Amino acid sequence: MEPLVTWVVPLLFLFLLSRQGAACRTSECCFQDPPYPDADSGSASGPRDLRCYRISSDRYECSWQYEGPTAGVSHFLRCCLSSGRCCYFAAGSATRLQFSDQAGVSVLYTVTLWVESWARNQTEKSPEVTLQLYNSVKYEPPLGDIKVSKLAGQLRMEWETPDNQVGAEVQFRHRTPSSPWKLGDCGPQDDDTESCLCPLEMNVAQEFQLRRRQLGSQGSSWSKWSSPVCVPPENPPQPQVRFSVEQLGQDGRRRLTLKEQPTQLELPEGCQGLAPGTEVTYRLQLHMLSCPCKAKATRTLHLGKMPYLSGAAYNVAVISSNQFGPGLNQTWHIPADTHTEPVALNISVGTNGTTMYWPARAQSMTYCIEWQPVGQDGGLATCSLTAPQDPDPAGMATYSWSRESGAMGQEKCYYITIFASAHPEKLTLWSTVLSTYHFGGNASAAGTPHHVSVKNHSLDSVSVDWAPSLLSTCPGVLKEYVVRCRDEDSKQVSEHPVQPTETQVTLSGLRAGVAYTVQVRADTAWLRGVWSQPQRFSIEVQVSDWLIFFASLGSFLSILLVGVLGYLGLNRAARHLCPPLPTPCASSAIEFPGGKETWQWINPVDFQEEASLQEALVVEMSWDKGERTEPLEKTELPEGAPELALDTELSLEDGDRCKAKM
């Protein structure tokens, strides 16, 4: 048994050695058939982007990318020499392989390289690369800081050339948040500093990557892509923010608050997160419109730092900027705080000028006194800056001016604001001391009420009206009206205060028939006004209405009685002076009995018995319609009366006709 073992073991060892010699070494390119079917499956996935280059004097490297699932994938680097012989390197699951110039691959002559991947029982091939390995140097992408600037509406990128790699061909690719990669060419580079001109977008951010390869070697491999270069849009996005201002505090300051944050810029995938170069900086620029005589009117702050402001008027601008410069601004106007304190400011007007007194804030305070006519544009405001001053013993600060200066010399209403600051050079340290109204010029004379009128109100009162004083147009200046009434007989004077909003008062307790004079003046808190022109009036003595009624009634009854008596007297006189005449038809004297007989007489001698008697004819008249008549009056014919000729025939029908007429 031992002799058999002695012979078998050496033979087995020799057999293994012979088999190892026949097998391909891992460090060499194997010139045998590959251990897989050599046929491209045409799959869309597989190895891509093969690059082969020299990394040292005798060392070379090939690398590639694989797209698709990597589990169970084996990679083989294939190489065909110019003679037509082909070999392969087994790389396993790695995508990078190194070999020396002794691996059986010609490095001084042109060779063709590609990658075959065996996966899922199929073969996937990469595109072929033909090159001379010794001259194919591995170029690095742009390293370090890539400077980005704007040149003639284009984007210019500049970087330092990697060491020992002068002379390169450079490409770039770029994309936006909503677009895929786009390839561009930078052209040949042959200097220690390389640059590239790229398109610049106006309103969207871009991501750029650069790669390099040896100039003049078309078969050489490209370097890997550089790190992302994030470029902001040419125009920074305009901020859409909103501010609010709090109420003015006791310290004369109010807080400016940002209500809405600016919108964030949309970035491509490779620039999301901390992407230097795409930052948009928002700054807050304050412009204090009030107190134009101060040394500094503007200040720029970071948007995140909200300042405290005085009660002055401001323009607040939000400035957006990126590495290309500032963009469009958005400006808001913050109006001045109009809260007034009419009792906080004392004004003394004298022959030498005017002096203001107000409560001092602190030691060494600089005050800015600003005034402007009410109703005018704020740009017409005038101001005066005082030197730093300490409070007087009464704790007051003062400011004086002469009449020659013309300050507030016109007779009109002025709005006065006083600001204070211990550091006037710092715009955000101003505070409002007070705001009030003041009537300039000769307020006593200018405020005198005009058009004073007096109207009767009752038997012992009158209503006094007047036009509003000019002081009433100045809020808080007019304290009250005073109406003075003077009794011209007793020389007694009474004064009546009236609210500044009223222009009418009723004076009562007056006596009829007495002369009075009335005057009106307008007073301020620090000055008495001038009396208006006196208006004279009196209340007439009034007669009782009942007395007038009874007097009128007596007159009426007297006239009525006289009329009745006169009428009766005239009636009686008319009966005596003008008695009524008889009515023939109403008298029975003309009625004759016996039918239609005619009586004629011409001369009394025809009736001797009548003529001798010489009796008077008596005619009786009856007022009744019946046969009975009563004599009312008797008329006697005197002697010597003319003869009565009765040549009329009266019949019964004629008598009836007369009765009918009656």
From Swiss-Prot:
Listed Basic and acidic residues bias regions: 626-637
GO molecular function: coreceptor activity; cytokine binding; cytokine receptor activity
Record: glycosylation sites: N121, N329, N346, N352, N442, N456
Cysteine disulfide partners in this protein: C52-C62
Region called Disordered, residue ranges: 626-648
Residue ranges annotated as Cytoplasmic topological domain: 571-662
SMART domains: FN3 (SM00060)
Keyword set, alphabetical order: Disease variant, Disulfide bond, Glycoprotein, Membrane, Receptor, Repeat, Signal, Transmembrane, Transmembrane helix
Motif, WSXWS motif: chain positions: 222-226
Keyword rRNA-binding in record: no
GO biological process, one term: positive regulation of defense response to virus by host
Subunit structure: Dimer or oligomer; disulfide-linked. Interacts with IL12RB2 to form the high affinity IL12 receptor. Heterodimer with IL23R; in presence of IL23. The heterodimer forms the IL23 receptor.
Family designation: Belongs to the type I cytokine receptor family. Type 2 subfamily.
Medical condition linked: Immunodeficiency 30: A form of Mendelian susceptibility to mycobacterial disease, a rare condition caused by impairment of interferon-gamma mediated immunity. It is characterized by predisposition to illness caused by moderately virulent mycobacterial species, such as Bacillus Calmette-Guerin (BCG) vaccine, environmental non-tuberculous mycobacteria, and by the more virulent Mycobacterium tuberculosis.
Domain notes: The WSXWS motif appears to be necessary for proper protein folding and thereby efficient intracellular transport and cell-surface receptor binding. The box 1 motif is required for JAK interaction and/or activation.
UniProt protein name: Interleukin-12 receptor subunit beta-1
